[in-house]
Amino acid sequence: MSETLLSSRNLAFELYEVLDAEGLTQRERFAEHNRETFDAAIGTARSIAEKFFAPHNRKGDENEPRYENGQAILIPEVKPAVDAFLEAGFLNAARSFDAGGMQLPTLLSQACFAHFQSANAASTSYPFLTMGAANLIESFGTEEQKQRFLQPMIDGRFFGTMALTEPHAGSSLSDIRTRAEPASDGTYRLKGNKIFISGGDHPLSENIVHMVLAKLPDAPAGVKGISLFIVPKFLVNDDGSLGKRNDVLLAGLFHKMGWRGTTSTALNFGDNGECVGYLVGKPHHGLSYMFQMMNEARIGVGMGAVMLGYAGYLYSLEYARERPQGRVPDSKDPNTAPVAIIQHADVKRMLLTQKAYVEGSFDLGLYAARLFDDTTTLATEAERKQAHELLDLLTPIVKSWPSEFCLKANELAIQILGGHGYTREYPVEQYYRDNRLNPIHEGTHGIQSLDLLGRKLAQNGGAGLKQLIRLIADTAERAQAYESLNALREPLEKLVARLQTVTLGLLTDLAQGKVNSSLANSALYLKVFGHTVIGWRWLEQAIRAEEGLTKGNAADVSFYKGKLQAARYFLTWEVPGCHHELAILEALDDVCLNMQDEWF
């Protein structure tokens, strides 16, 4: 039977040949695990995803949540799927044994989650949002807040959301208008409107805990005046039982292009002046707290984009193998049988492009998860700091590159299916629609590019960038052991050298106050930087593939040769094109910056 969620062989390659998941078991936190426990968790995830999540993916798309009597109504299949996820323990996959968790490395929890993201992005989002909200309370909440709200979330009784966006303030959070007035009992009364709140209402849990950004009456202007509040759908009594309904109203549902099975809500807080909220942490520190959840979410968005691209790639690959159509160009006999379309060179190009984008992104997402483990479990503080600096630098790439290029992979999957791909009878058009959200939410491409070029590169004296350059150089040096990899290594080394020169120039211009011109083409910089990182990850995979071929396992020869061909494609077809964009960046080209609105 063909695999539809992801390639189990490729996952094993990443975990055990590229990223050394077993090496993590040498660390104290993961010492009770081994490859058997890792594989058991992955097997359970695959089984639940196939049995409970994948079967209603299309139905959830065709039957959006409905707004009835102030509530959101979902199709009945969502609840059993989410319950199966909870019962298997995946909500607390990374949490410690003492807290009732599986104490898995983040690398392994992300490997497990990938199956759910591929099977059904919409239904998966409900527990995923809850994990992020719970982590936020765990990091910054009081002991009372943890007992009242966090523990029921860990138990799967309460779910969570992230409530940031307002009708007039999307990316520009400094302009939010939701207000929080202090009450005599130490709580706050919130008033305002939030939109596009995923999971803002549903019947899947006893309660919903909204993490809400708002401003206090004495708040400073801008982002330094934003505070964070816990606002439950139902108030919680001191004994843990549910109290009365809080003054949070579901005002309506948005009807989306994709991701239709997830409620996208408009929420009104405090229409009756009785919306109770609880301040999290210090006043005016809300955005810095929320960024923890947002950074986690951005990595999750990147992996979600990967898995939708992966699902489309696998489906179009199977289709191309089974669909007979036409004959190869040198076939002169019209009586010969049509060949499977995978025999046509242009179809191979589209499949190879998908493979390069999807498997390159998959490697990067899991590498980021491995880095997250390093930030918490490496032996020394200096090592943990290094890992954090690198992860911080790579986060905009982990979020944005798969969101752009795995969406392109979905487009190619549709093209391979031809007319069938354009119909709703085949799943690839839904994968595209679902994936189109990922370049938008949790920080658009433009926001990510400004974050990378305007902030992350120079952070801590450029420590993250210097570390990345050293890692790429190390990979290139190890690649020299294989003559066949010279043609792959050299384009990457040329790109890295050119990127360093252009980056230094841009950072110098920024330091000299040329802010607008230096950042005007930041989206191009994001793309080139991303191609550099993905090129590095493909060269690393190519080295591991060569090592695998050297071991001589006949059953894996085709797998490893496929890896080498995809690496060759990306490093010799995609990477060289970045030099044109670097020239535009170096020149501080102003064609976009100086375009006037009346000229359009």
What are these regions (language model features)?
Residues 2-5, 10, 182, 259, ...:
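Alpha-helix capping/hinge segments and adjacent helical runs
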Residues 359-398, 504-520, 541-558:
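C-terminal helix-coil-helix/basic helical segment that borders enzyme active sites and/or dimer interfaces
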Residues 99, 459, 475-600:
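C-terminal amphipathic alpha-helical interaction region
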Residues 126-130, 141-183, 193, 369-388, ...:
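Internal maturation/activation junctions in enzymes
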Residues 1-124, 148, 373, 583-584, ...:
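Amphipathic, small/basic residue-rich leader segments at the start of a protein or domain
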Residues 196, 235-251, 256, 266-297, ...:
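A glycine-rich, basic-preceded beta-loop-alpha segment at the flavin cofactor/substrate interface
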Residues 187, 191-245:
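A short core secondary-structure module
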Residues 133, 142-145, 149, 444, ...:
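A structural-propensity feature for long, helix-poor, extended segments
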